[in-house]
Amino acid sequence: MGVRDDDFVQVDVTGEDAPVARNVLAETWGEIVAHDGGLDAGEEYVGTLESWDDVGFTLDAGVDVFVPADELGLGVGSPEQVVERFGLVQHLPLRFVYGGDAGDPDAEPSRLADAERDRLYDWRRGDGRVNVNSATRGETRATVNRAGHAQDIVTVERLGLLEQSIVCAEGTDPPGLLAAIGSYLPAEMRCVV
């Protein structure tokens, strides 16, 4: 076990039960696979949302992967507007299709995977969510309870190690929930409505 240069924990598992242990760790905490041999063009990977600007998203998949704005596939608007519309928080795990190395003349731009686009659109079709960064699932759930809003949510989904999604019950206003819990939880939070 160690810490990578980008402050993510790295766990190497060996032995007879290694595949089972890897699966349990990945299911419990999520995973970003280290791609020491590089990424293969056309393959789907998971990276965390590192940053965004006017031209696209930068994902961390062991190496920085740039997804241009026109390859997000999440409707019109700038990447900043997409972040707000879908309630994306920094370090949120996102699936993407790697386009190829920047110096390769045959490379295509990287893009969000179709399954990822579907997941994000499903969030918008639901009753609303509040996405949280920098808090565990337990901390997030306890904060909702402390604020007196336990009946206003369905569950708290773990999206990543410290990235959670509070799924609102029918009739709950996500911006109102965010306002109610915001003073209790020092974290980045965004609504999906």
Go through each PLM region and give its residues.
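Beta-strand/loop nucleic-acid-binding surfaces
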Residues: 34, 64-87
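Short aromatic-glycine-enriched beta-strand elements
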Residues: 54-59
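OB-fold/S1-family RNA-binding modules
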Residues: 1-25, 53, 86-193
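Well-ordered beta-strand positions in beta-sheet-rich domains
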Residues: 44-46, 64-66, 106
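A residue-level detector for short acidic-glycine micro-motifs
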Residues: 49-51
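Generic alpha-helical propensity signal that fires on short helical segments
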Residues: 27-31, 67, 77, 150, ...
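Short boundary/loop segments of OB/S1/cold-shock single-stranded nucleic-acid-binding domains
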Residues: 21-41, 83-85
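Short nucleic-acid-contacting surface segments enriched for D/E, G, S/T with interspersed K/R
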Residues: 39-44, 76-99
